Amino acid sequence: MTGKIFLTLISLLYGYLCFGQYPNVLVGNTGYPEEPSIFINPDHTNQMVAASNIDNYYYSGDGGYSWQSGTITSSYGVWGDPCVVIDTAGNLYYFHLSNPSFGSWIDRIVCQKSIDGGQTWSDGTSMGLNGIKAQDKPWSIVDRSNNTIYVCWTQFDRYGSSSPNDSSVILFSRSTDNGQIWSLAKRINRQAGDCLDGDNTVEGAVPVVGPNGEIYVSWAGPLGIVFNKSLDGGETWMDTNIFVTDIPGGWDFQIPGIYRANGLPVTCCDISDGPYRGNLYINWSDQRNGPTDTDVWLVKSTNQGTTWSSPVKVNDDPPGHQQFFTWMTVDQKTGFIWFVFYDRREHSDWLTDVYMAVSRDGGETFQNFKISDSSFYPNPSVFFGDYTNISAFNNIVRPIWTRLNNGYLGIWTAIVDSMFVGISKDLENILPLSLEQNWPNPVKNVTYISFKVYVSSTITLRVFDIFGREISTMVDNQKFNAGKYIEYFDASAHHLVPGFYYFSLVSGETSLQRKMLVE
């Protein structure tokens, strides 16, 4: 049963324009987690998977409002550096380092697969085994045109060795059968690095797929940031790596209060149907402006990586502040570039916030905004991991980061609806509507759902379960004039079992969601 109450539009515009809070959601805080990865299923954006060191996995069926979790196990052992991706069949893949009882520490890269949304995982397959050489820092991408999976990582002859006879290289492997068999690892870098896990080590290889199946990847090392590509699915690569840019001060640097920090690069390619389709982007951080002024940077290429732009700064604060642990993604529906990073622009000590930035014009300009609902102090004796992460599709954006709270690490995300990012105070730029949290929440019987309409719009309001199955259509394609409206929803009439549900407000290309709990 539903009903409607109309309230006149008084002071709503002011409240709308002042909107700036992004709900923070705790993903998990068991096992001292850090170094998170997250992925939104582009085919079902309410389905998300995440992971963190050393063996944690998380999955959500309601757009990241709530999470289930567990620890992953494998006969190959699990030793962190997680990366998660999803293919077009809905299979989830979890890549990590190994620690087998029958081999050597991190002697291969492991891929474990889930076919039930992350509830259970296979024992896994592996790639890169090469005696006792160490295989480290994997990252993966799925070519969604054919579900081929690509992985890049760093191989150390002997991790931590200072011997000039030991070196580090970038390796590549692929699977064409949904992760069952992996190709023989292939070296794709020409200039080797050392094994000290520092500025002169080659690390940070994040592969991406281009509009026509190209594979692009960059990494950092003794030459700065360099780039390679394959035009035949990884069979062959360029004989000469392309120099992209210097990293003044190196990729391995110090941030006060952080156990270990780096500015390793992240590579992305725009394969949307937007105006910047085919653009390549590389994002990193460095201390070219001094050790007290770490900044986030971006370069781009419009010719498949042949030439690169000069670096542009992503963070828009005055000099003298720290921005670090950046990650980037491209929304392959809109072509928008999204960044997440830690930020101290509002503080003079170690107090830390989490910021995001977005570029809607192909990396020419950036808007920065804070997403953490409170600041935190890190502890230099607590390992924070080596990266944050972010995923986006069709204006649904989910960053993920590590936070220290009362001595305990936790993994957090934020509900970032891109329609709320960059609200202008010019009336012609305001958005058509907003959706408020239901009340009461949790719900025992009846709850009220309110929304505000700023421009006359045609509205649909529905309630779904966490699997995306429709429970009720409360408003079906009805036109509303400017104002505030309240719909009431009778949960008992629909015989809902206790648990999480969500409601969705849609008008044209604008889609808003919120979660509610039925007791």
Residue ranges and their predicted role:
Residues 2-11:
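Sec-dependent signal peptide recognition
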Residues 424-464, 473, 485-495, 506-510:
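Glycine-centered coil/turn sites that cap beta-strands in beta-rich domains
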Residues 472-480:
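Solvent-exposed serine/threonine-rich low-complexity stretches and specific carbohydrate-binding patches
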